[in-house]
Amino acid sequence: MTVSPRLQNLVSWDSDWAGLRVAVTGIGVSGFAAADTLIELGARVVVVDAATSDTARAQADTLKIVGAVDVLLGEEAVNRIPKIDGGFPELIVTSPGWRPDQALLAAAARAHIPVWGDVELAWRLRVRAGHKTADWLTITGTNGKTTTVGLTASMLQAAGLKAIAVGNVGTPILDALRDPVEYDAFAVELSSFQLHWAESLSPVASVCLNVAEDHVDWHGSYNSYLADKAKVYARTQKACIFNAEQIETERMVEDADVIEGCRAVGVTTLTPAISMLGVVEGLLVDRAFIEERKDSAAELASMSDLGQFAPRHMVANALAAAALVRAYGVDAKAVRQGIQDYVPGNHRIQPVAKQNGVLWVNDSKATNPHAAAASLATFENVIWIAGGLSKGVSYDHLVRDNAARLKAVVLIGTDTAALADALQRHAPDVPVITTPAGDTENMQTAATGGAITGSSPDSGAAVMSRAVASAAQLAASGDTVLMAPAAASMDQFSSYAHRGDAFIDAVRELVEGQAQTGEE
């Protein structure tokens, strides 16, 4: 696609954005931030979204007040390219969840209208006269992104730097750019969706933590998904960090077009080779960013610094974060302090309760088989609550590799056929209970051009309450009830957090009831 000279020259906050006709697709968190920013820059902005909820209408009213040309809501609004001041947009800025084959975006491709994501827009706005320009450390991967981003920001802060975690989850990067705080560095979480719409990022250091089959429905194929993940390494300045235990990420680095002088640095949960970070006798060590790396290693932290649970994937995340900040010049002491200061987010292998010898664990963030495998590997004698929207993935490897640790399975969700079939093939002796879906509706996702709408909180809570009750009947002292769904949540919940909160509420209600009745 030929890009107009005007768009090519939009490389800073101080470039000529005034009067630029821009359509923003999506009125959610990232779409709202993009529209608000572009309006501030003087662009002529029209926003479209399929949603017609009260929240969407309130967002629309706000954008109109601050200067949007128009905000168009409803299904018709997202099926065609909107006109702006009588002409087509010169640029479309899309929210990450919108698929390339969505009607409006497909029409834009046919009309040769450039499409950026919010991250691409943020990169082009990062330089601003009279303001500090924050450096970017970028993180992607099928799993572990949010944890690694949080650890990276914590380590940077422990080194005395002004840093913040931004991107796919948490603070929208455009909001961070406009924050009165002048940051030294951003720890940027990038989804495959965001990378798909990014073309010019050049981070100081970058990492793809891991890859596994995920979002095939969005990308069209696993190879397309890998290609978008690999874009995290493009134009990296100092260090491309890869998972030395997964050849796909190393190949991404080998194929990346990087800035001259950029290094390839591996991370492993095993003993590290030269130019790697890894683990030696319970210590996290660095053999990459030290002078005498040929025959020595720098101690960064101990396994105990990672807390009560230090599953293998958590160790890998900490090592990846350490590699990023070490590439940025952070010392070993700050790495340890950052790990100790880090508070893990909810819904990530989160112990909820222990009653009558049964441990209840919430890992609602495990939205695909790869994440669920890491969670299952942490425990034995598991009653597994799983299911949801499968996103077109296979469950055969997950079930086959973990069948021996499964005591029983409680299925939730409206799209459980693939998981149920895998259980029948590879764990035929494991009892499986299917929780009725009840009156829940399918949630509408941004892939169709809309903000999430649909199912009521009460219906999701009822499903989870039934699942928890079923698990309680199966569990005995020494067992773990693990909610690690291996699927997306939008069939019965508004988000993985909503699903996790429903699990927590149901478990606490169960435990309180057992305590009051003296049930053993």
Where are these regions (language model features)?
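N-terminal leader/targeting and accessory segments in enzymes
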Residues: M1-L121, G513
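Residue-level signal for inorganic ion chemistry
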Residues: L38, I92, I139, N168, ...
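Short beta-strand "acidic-cap" motif of Rossmann-like dinucleotide-binding folds
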Residues: R44-D49, I164-A165, A187, G266, ...
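Beta-strand->loop->alpha-helix junctions that form or flank phosphate-binding loops
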Residues: D49, L72-E75, W116-L121, V166, ...
